[in-house]
Amino acid sequence: MEILWKTLTWILSLIMASSEFHSDHRLSYSSQEEFLTYLEHYQLTIPIRVDQNGAFLSFTVKNDKHSRRRRSMDPIDPQQAVSKLFFKLSAYGKHFHLNLTLNTDFVSKHFTVEYWGKDGPQWKHDFLDNCHYTGYLQDQRSTTKVALSNCVGLHGVIATEDEEYFIEPLKNTTEDSKHFSYENGHPHVIYKKSALQQRHLYDHSHCGVSDFTRSGKPWWLNDTSTVSYSLPINNTHIHHRQKRSVSIERFVETLVVADKMMVGYHGRKDIEHYILSVMNIVAKLYRDSSLGNVVNIIVARLIVLTEDQPNLEINHHADKSLDSFCKWQKSILSHQSDGNTIPENGIAHHDNAVLITRYDICTYKNKPCGTLGLASVAGMCEPERSCSINEDIGLGSAFTIAHEIGHNFGMNHDGIGNSCGTKGHEAAKLMAAHITANTNPFSWSACSRDYITSFLDSGRGTCLDNEPPKRDFLYPAVAPGQVYDADEQCRFQYGATSRQCKYGEVCRELWCLSKSNRCVTNSIPAAEGTLCQTGNIEKGWCYQGDCVPFGTWPQSIDGGWGPWSLWGECSRTCGGGVSSSLRHCDSPAPSGGGKYCLGERKRYRSCNTDPCPLGSRDFREKQCADFDNMPFRGKYYNWKPYTGGGVKPCALNCLAEGYNFYTERAPAVIDGTQCNADSLDICINGECKHVGCDNILGSDAREDRCRVCGGDGSTCDAIEGFFNDSLPRGGYMEVVQIPRGSVHIEVREVAMSKNYIALKSEGDDYYINGAWTIDWPRKFDVAGTAFHYKRPTDEPESLEALGPTSENLIVMVLLQEQNLGIRYKFNVPITRTGSGDNEVGFTWNHQPWSECSATCAGGVQRQEVVCKRLDDNSIVQNNYCDPDSKPPENQRACNTEPCPPEWFIGDWLECSKTCDGGMRTRAVLCIRKIGPSEEETLDYSGCLTHRPVEKEPCNNQSCPPQWVALDWSECTPKCGPGFKHRIVLCKSSDLSKTFPAAQCPEESKPPVRIRCSLGRCPPPRWVTGDWGQCSAQCGLGQQMRTVQCLSYTGQASSDCLETVRPPSMQQCESKCDSTPISNTEECKDVNKVAYCPLVLKFKFCSRAYFRQMCCKTCQGH
């Protein structure tokens, strides 16, 4: 009853909000009068308005103050409508005292339904009527639910423990309802839900659909996913990324578009209700805990196309239709809203767009076929790729839409590039490449969970982080199978004449009559809530593919985090590694639609932070060297770390030693690898994570100017100077001595010159630019630290090191021309009593602007706030400054101009053949990034470099032998049960060679004999032979023949009917010779006459003929 109430609350507002189109909500009846004739029973009642105690107030039940408001007006004032109402009515021998409260949170102010003609939007409504109420029956609060609207009288449902009652105003057929008199009350019709006859209420299915029985075809009888066109994720995004491995709630604000074919098929009266019912199922699928993330599908905008749009081409060709739709939806994307506010134009922003069409779409051609969905892989949050096209096949379309949105989230098919759905692993689920009766489309596989988690953790779903101020659509909790029964679900798929034709496993597969009157299935389960029956359950309904007792629904249990696992093995043995710990959402595990856990699911900590022994190989260098024995483009190289600019710090970029190129050998270094040599920050999961100077991951500990972790800068003195002595050219001159233990060393020319900075030890051993030899600018490991020698072409040269130095050093200059001046500064250690806190003050300061996070298309610069000493402006730990006075960090946009065009290269799609040579393709696009999360597609001519290949051969290896079956023989015997036989050979893939049977897998060998029957065999029958010779050579005699009872096989049988047995003997007559026998002849019986004894017996001897033939017998008689 709770479910029914929530659904009817939703349906009621939907009906009333669409009253500008049709005042009558029964979708196939031309009048209320006609509808009432189809009710088994109903009653009339006159409701009255009363107070809380039931005392009469008025006959007026209509809300005179309600009005439809546009978003451009002031927000609705709840005081304009009565927030609390009480009504009384009587029917079916019962009295109903209604206690109602105004429902102001039914839908968000974002949600609109728009109807578009050829010139764009024609009409829209936004559900802002102030006349929707929910409540209960007075004194029965816990057992009753009421959802009513009084926009034009009482319209809605009253749900009690034993029955649901529908109530609506009785229409006045003689007067305009606006002028109807309420002085004596307005009659209303009330009827029970049980009075509704089970018949098809929707007569608008005039667009026929083709029959299809697509068992075993790709997803929902074929799904296609285009490759990802997204740019690699890098540091050009302006959004702050969420910490990895953290479960947070996401909100997918969705635009749903129905084409004119949908309007023609479902009719304007039902299109909104139907689409939102489908999206309700989609939302529920994404709320399933098996997804491993909390994702809310929110319908922010519904567009119903009543005519073709000028810039939108929708037809059977799925690829072209998707491309057109993605561009079109981007063109109408509201940029005035960020998802948290209501835009001035009243149009809601959307993150994802869904097109639903009645076209029988097909990928790669403009003809009908089995394709049901098409989407861009990993396109979510990219304005031109966060979209999908879906063929409407009834409520089962929800599974298609959820599947295609899954592709937008970066999911691949189960079993394609992963183990899910393969032998020995968990069964394929909602992302199955092929749907069968064994597929469970109500939940997600572990592979799908990993794909979406990786997508969201990588920062590509940041557009989903903003939570709308209110849920854009309050989905009904009622099961869709209760709204649309099995027959109606069949009609959605196969047309108005279809109905359910198999009733066994309806929760697993819905079988329907097609137009050709065949019982077919798409292997799509019936919607949840569809009535079912089993041997153990007399009346049940479907729940997640199973038949459960009617009315039962698992209790919703939200998930809770389990305990953290033990810390895992450290990623490094020294030098600072990372260890991780996991926890699972299983205490309890979410069930019955309960929410998945929010919060951190994986945590990290530093480990083995002690320095590696002297002489140890650099950790990044070792990772590059691991590729020395792996061929690269057919050759072997020795690889060294590439430390130049323009690459991701946590990708393993290696330089081919002795060659002028580098490449990315791995997308991520091993966890614990330093992001760069001069930072303690380390890489985790391919991202740079901050490490404090205490070597603790995420620590705020900071080095002071003396490189003391957490210090206040009091253990060293700052040395600064300017060397501008005029010196003779052509030799080395000393600039400054740097004592042992010095830190933050900087030596820099004040202007460009032909002179060179050099560095040597106290013992005159040159480390940089010695012996009149000029070194290439690079990093030099000297005195226990790294000196960076830089000589740009357009700037003065410099020498820098963090220190501390392990020996005394001397900075020299090799003079080739006049000394223009050299500045130097460094900090030297001192011995001081106390911390220095009383000698110097500290203050917050903004650091200089950071480098722009992107070179083009919009980046961000930040000014970090640090704590500094007042005496020398050096940075110290934050705890030395007053936390209450800390100013906010500054941020500004930078480099907003579009990026140069570049090629986007998508992932290779599956090979067209698994062996014997196939082809594989990938998407190659010329794109230009024009914003932090937005790019545009250009013509190929826009990119100046060579166009990458889009197609290449694959799987050229020979296929293994395979079984080939020849044609079946005829059925033997010709009737009754028998067998057909055929020859099965082990052949090569091209069928040119025959191999021994042992070379083909025995388990996959096709059968060589099957049972058959050509119909019932005929019954046994009497079979007669030819008649024998007549027994008399002259006159009458006898003929004999064989008579046998034989089966259809020719075998003797005793099953023939004696009553129809043919005679085996008959009388015959032979022609007699007329020449008389002479008296001299011997008197004897003619040999051929066998009946002479009968002649004597019947006294025929007196006759001349018989006496002559039987002379001997007749002698003496």
Swiss-Prot record:
Domain PLAC as annotated: residue spans: 1079-1117
GO biological process, one term: extracellular matrix organization
Primary location class: secreted
Keyword set includes tRNA-binding: no
Tissue specificity note: Expressed at low levels in placenta and barely detectable in a number of other tissues.
Pfam families to which the protein is assigned, alphabetical: ADAMTS_CR_2 (PF17771), ADAMTS_CR_3 (PF19236), ADAMTS_spacer1 (PF05986), Pep_M12B_propep (PF01562), PLAC (PF08686), Reprolysin (PF01421), TSP1_ADAMTS (PF19030), TSP_1 (PF00090)
Entry superkingdom: Eukaryota
Required cofactor names: Zn(2+)
Signal peptide as annotated in the record: 1-21
TSP type-1 domain ranges (all copies): 558-613, 840-900, 902-960, 962-1007, 1018-1073
Modification comment: The precursor is cleaved by a furin endopeptidase. Glycosylated. Can be O-fucosylated by POFUT2 on a serine or a threonine residue found within the consensus sequence C1-X(2)-(S/T)-C2-G of the TSP type-1 repeat domains where C1 and C2 are the first and second cysteine residue of the repeat, respectively. Fucosylated repeats can then be further glycosylated by the addition of a beta-1,3-glucose residue by the glucosyltransferase, B3GALTL. Fucosylation mediates the efficient secretion of ADAMTS family members.
Record-level Gene Ontology MF annotations: metal ion binding; metalloendopeptidase activity; metallopeptidase activity
Keyword Glycoprotein in annotation: yes
The EC number(s) this enzyme carries: 3.4.24.-
Gene Ontology cellular component annotations, sorted alphabetically: extracellular matrix; extracellular region
Cystine crosslinks: C326-C387, C362-C369, C381-C463, C420-C447, C490-C512, C501-C519, C507-C542, C532-C547, C570-C607, C574-C612, C585-C597, C911-C954, C915-C959, C926-C943
Domain Peptidase M12B: 250-468
Cofactor comment: Binds 1 zinc ion per subunit.
Glycosites: N99, N172, N222, N234, N724, N956
Broad enzyme group: hydrolase
Keywords: Cleavage on pair of basic residues, Disulfide bond, Extracellular matrix, Glycoprotein, Hydrolase, Metal-binding, Metalloprotease, Protease, Repeat, Secreted, Signal, Zinc, Zymogen
Induction: Isoform 1 and isoform 2 expressions are up-regulated by TNF in retinal pigment epithelial cells.
The Disintegrin domain, residue ranges: 495-557
Propeptide residues, chain positions: 22-244
Domains: entry comment: The spacer domain and the TSP type-1 domains are important for a tight interaction with the extracellular matrix.
The protein, known as: A disintegrin and metalloproteinase with thrombospondin motifs 6
Protein species of origin: Homo sapiens
